Regions:
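Active-site-proximal specificity loops/subdomain of glycosyltransferases
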Residues: 50-80, 84
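Acidic donor-binding segment of Leloir-type glycosyltransferases
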Residues: 28-55
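Short aromatic/hydrophobic "clamp" motif used to bind/position activated sugar donors
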Residues: 87
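Conserved small/polar residues in nucleotide/adenosyl-binding loops
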Residues: 301-307
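Catalytic core and acceptor-binding pocket of nucleotide-sugar-dependent glycosyltransferases
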Residues: 150-261
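Short, acidic, metal-binding catalytic loop of nucleotide-sugar glycosyltransferases
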Residues: 20-29
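N-proximal low-complexity "stem/linker" segments adjacent to membrane-targeting elements
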Residues: 1-8
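Conserved donor-nucleotide/metal-binding helix-loop-beta segment in metal-dependent transferases, i.e.
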Residues: 100-126
Length: 307
């Protein structure tokens, strides 16, 4: 029987996280990271023993600590000793559009597929995208209490880096070689062997870690680079050609990307129903309640009928 490990990051809205866990609680276990900047008590009260909480990291968007909490979650899954068939990475503001039976059946039918998008950034001709790795992006993980001063420092350093002739190579050191860097969404669903491979590389490839510590949003780069330079590469979802954008690189989620991710409301229901996606984001308690109540999870039979 298939069993899924859901690894989830959250920093607010404990009631919705409890709702998400309840919706997916079928042949599944939940491993949760709560940002150290947040109060964990509402999450403990809302979830109790329904989830496994992992050691916490202080998260700054776009910083290396986002990869560290993913590593923490993978460690908990692997050390559990449970032979999961799939490890699914979610945020605490996701919600399923499919029934649990449909999710399990779909993964069973695609048991060798690694649902992680990848685009070769090393070969990319769009300078703005290439700068994610060739420009240094320091200071994002500084544990400053003043977000205002921290953001000022980040912006100033970014402008300085654009002026100074200091660049990183568009290759990441991996297994003693210069590996192409791949970019994709940090929400994915990979097999347990692939998850183990990723975790081992995060533990042993010190030069790789050092390289990505100063990259822009390494959670969209590091694990993708490991997978697409691994024996699992042919099973991943590689996009070639022109830069496709993050929407196409997010295989299982419907997300309205923009300057910031848009909160979903009842008005988005028709689009979500037609998207064919397994999950949606961003769901917020209060604002999205009517949408969640209106979602009728897509059945496995419905999926097969529309293939």
């Amino acid at each position: 029987m298939s069993r899924i490990a859901y690894i989830i990051s959250a920093y607010k809205d404990a009631p919705h996280l409890a709702r998400l866990v309840a919706a997916l609680d079928d042949r599944a276990d939940f491993y949760v990271h709560i940002d150290l900047n947040a109060d964990i008590h509402p999450f403990e009260e809302a979830l109790g023993d329904k989830v496994t909480f992992v050691p916490r990291h202080r998260i700054s968007w776009g910083g290396w600590e986002q990869v560290e909490y993913q590593k923490e979650l993978l460690a908990a899954v692997l050390h559990s000793g449970i032979p999961y068939t799939r490890v699914v990475c979610l945020s605490g503001q996701d919600y399923p559009l499919w029934s649990n039976n449909a999710i399990h059946r779909y993964f069973e039918e695609h048991q060798d597929t690694e649902f992680i998008g990848g685009f070769n950034l090393t070969r990319c001709t769009v300078k703005q995208q290439l700068h994610k790795i060739t420009h240094y992006h320091p200071f994002r993980d500084l544990p400053w209490k003043s977000i205002w001063w921290k953001n000022k420092l980040i912006v100033a350093s970014r402008k300085l880096v654009q002026i100074l002739p200091i660049r990183k190579a568009p290759f990441a050191p991996l297994e003693g070689k210069q590996a192409d860097v791949y970019f994709g969404s940090d929400y994915w669903a990979i097999t347990l062997p692939c998850a183990r491979y990723v975790y081992e590389k995060l533990c042993t490839e010190e030069k790789l870690v050092k390289y990505f510590r100063t990259s822009f949003v390494p959670s969209e780069l590091c694990i993708q680079t490991i997978v697409f330079n691994s024996p699992f590469a042919s099973k991943g979802l590689l996009l070639e050609g022109e830069y496709p954008g993050l929407t196409r690189l997010t295989p299982l989620h419907y997300i309205d990307y923009g300057a910031s991710i848009r909160v979903m409301t009842l008005e988005d229901l028709p689009v979500l129903q037609q998207s064919g996606k397994m999950f949606c984001r961003k769901i917020v308690s209060g604002t999205s309640d009517r949408l969640v109540e209106a979602i009728e999870p897509v059945s496995y039979t419905h999926l097969r009928a529309h293939e």
